[in-house]
């Protein structure tokens, strides 16, 4: 009987030892006492996986545009560059052709990082201002101004009402805030429907009017009301026939062409 219990004791002891060894292997290394030790460091690690927000939208950003050339005379600081072909900047539309259900966290917000003044919209347009840089040294050599056109159209269907209008955005949280006029007076509702596909040709392809005729007045829209269904699209760009006005900090000099570049950062978030 003694030998039986002694065997069970040693078996348990062996199992405990194996469990400790397995635990040490899983954690990467076992702690140890170090005679006359001087300390060390405790390493912490893991993995942070981005939480990809699923929305009903898809976004298109314009391609780089080259060949924006013009003649400039020595001593001249300002030159106009003709835009012979529309320059698309940003398009936002629904992924599906059927209206989606409203919910929190999916209303598009647009940030052009100070390049446009959304309070100065008139007839679906405002001024775009960018720093002009030396293409080789990336040093600022002037600024660029152009007429920036943009707009959005949305539809909404609720239990007791429906709407289909051009969009303005007064405050953060309104649909397309940062990319359209803050006030309804800056929106030309009669012209916006033709303007948007001129800026981004296929931007309206997935729009669902939900059987509602477009009204004359512009309105704000959010896409957060549960129980409502929505569809919308947005486009921005510089229209063909406009000019880019480049204003140099110093007059042109010498015979070497001035190679320039300008960048317009665009950020779309959802709230």
Features from the language model and the residues they span:
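Generic alpha-helical secondary structure signal
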Residues: 116, 211, 234-238
């Amino acid at each position: 009987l003694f030998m039986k219990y002694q065997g069970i004791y040693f078996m348990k002891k062996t199992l405990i030892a194996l469990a400790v060894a397995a635990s040490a292997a899983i954690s990467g290394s076992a702690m140890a006492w170090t005679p006359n030790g001087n300390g060390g460091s405790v390493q912490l690690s893991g993995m942070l996986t981005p939480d990809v927000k699923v929305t009903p939208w898809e976004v298109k950003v314009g391609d780089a545009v080259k060949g924006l050339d013009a003649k400039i005379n020595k001593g001249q600081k300002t030159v106009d560059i003709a835009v012979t072909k529309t320059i698309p900047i940003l398009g936002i539309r629904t992924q599906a052709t059927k209206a989606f259900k409203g919910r929190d966290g999916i209303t598009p917000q647009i940030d052009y990082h100070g390049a446009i003044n959304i309070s100065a919209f008139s007839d679906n347009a405002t001024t775009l201002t960018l720093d002009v840089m030396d293409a080789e040294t990336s040093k600022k050599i002037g600024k660029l101004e152009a007429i920036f056109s943009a707009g959005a159209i949305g539809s909404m269907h609720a239990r007791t009402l429906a709407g289909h209008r051009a969009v303005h955005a007064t405050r953060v949280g309104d649909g397309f805030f940062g990319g359209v006029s803050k006030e309804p007076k800056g929106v030309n509702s009669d012209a916006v429907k033709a303007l948007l596909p001129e800026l981004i040709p296929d931007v309206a392809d997935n729009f669902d009017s939900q059987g509602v005729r477009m009204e004359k007045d512009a309105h704000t829209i959010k896409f957060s009301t549960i129980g409502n269904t929505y569809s919308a699209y947005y486009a921005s760009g510089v229209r063909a026939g406009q000019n880019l006005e480049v204003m140099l900090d110093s007059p042109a000099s010498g015979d070497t062409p001035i190679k320039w570049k300008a960048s317009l950062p665009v950020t779309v978030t959802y709230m």
